[in-house]
UniProtKB/Swiss-Prot annotation:
An N-terminally truncated form of flagellin of unknown function. The gene is yvzB. This is Putative flagellin YvzB. Belongs to the bacterial flagellin family. InterPro entries: Flagellin, Flagellin_C, Flagellin_C_sub2. It holds the Pfam family Flagellin_C. It is found in: Bacterial flagellum.
Length: 160
């Protein structure tokens, strides 16, 4: 039983993410996540201590029922299991909320990208049509100017 209690404490002390211990109860303010674009859109997750002391199983002794009756020790184990189950249920609810938030943010990101694309991207067919429409008068003007410049040359050649 001592080995199991040590393992519970070991898991409680070793479980960490990003340098922060998750299950030892030291993060009393919880873990805060930014889940939206605005400043107030945050989610705080509190994780209770899962150490053997916090769970109430650190003093179990399954070989000595004289000082602590078997029923009392069994109740301690049941209470610890219930505490762990309750914490897992809370974390599962938070996980569902985060997954929902991830899906919403993904849809928002896709919509924002599509809107930006509509603003930035050019309708090539329309723009080529506009270019051609504007280019025809310009080319016609250049051709007329070239012909007008040619006429004095033709007159000079006739006079020679």
């Amino acid at each position: 039983m001592d080995a199991l209690i040590e393992e519970v404490d070991g898991i409680s002390n070793r479980t960490e993410f990003n340098g922060k211990k998750l299950l030892d109860g030291t993060e009393t303010d919880g873990f805060t996540f930014q889940i939206g674009a605005n400043a107030g859109q945050q989610l705080t997750v509190n994780i209770d201590s899962m150490s053997s002391t916090a769970l109430g199983v650190n003093a179990l002794n399954v070989t000595d029922f004289a000082n602590t009756p078997f029923d009392t020790q069994l109740e301690s184990i049941d209470t610890a299991i219930n505490n762990v189950s309750n914490q897992r249920a809370k974390l599962g609810a938070v996980q569902n909320r985060l997954e929902h938030t991830i899906n919403n943010l993904g849809a928002s990101s896709e919509n924002l990208t599509a809107a930006e694309s509509r603003i930035r991207d050019v309708d090539m067919a329309k723009e080529m049509s506009e270019f051609t429409k504007n280019n025809i008068p310009s080319q016609a003007s250049q051709a007329m100017l070239a012909q007008a410049n040619q006429q004095p040359q033709n007159v000079l050649q006739l006079l020679r």
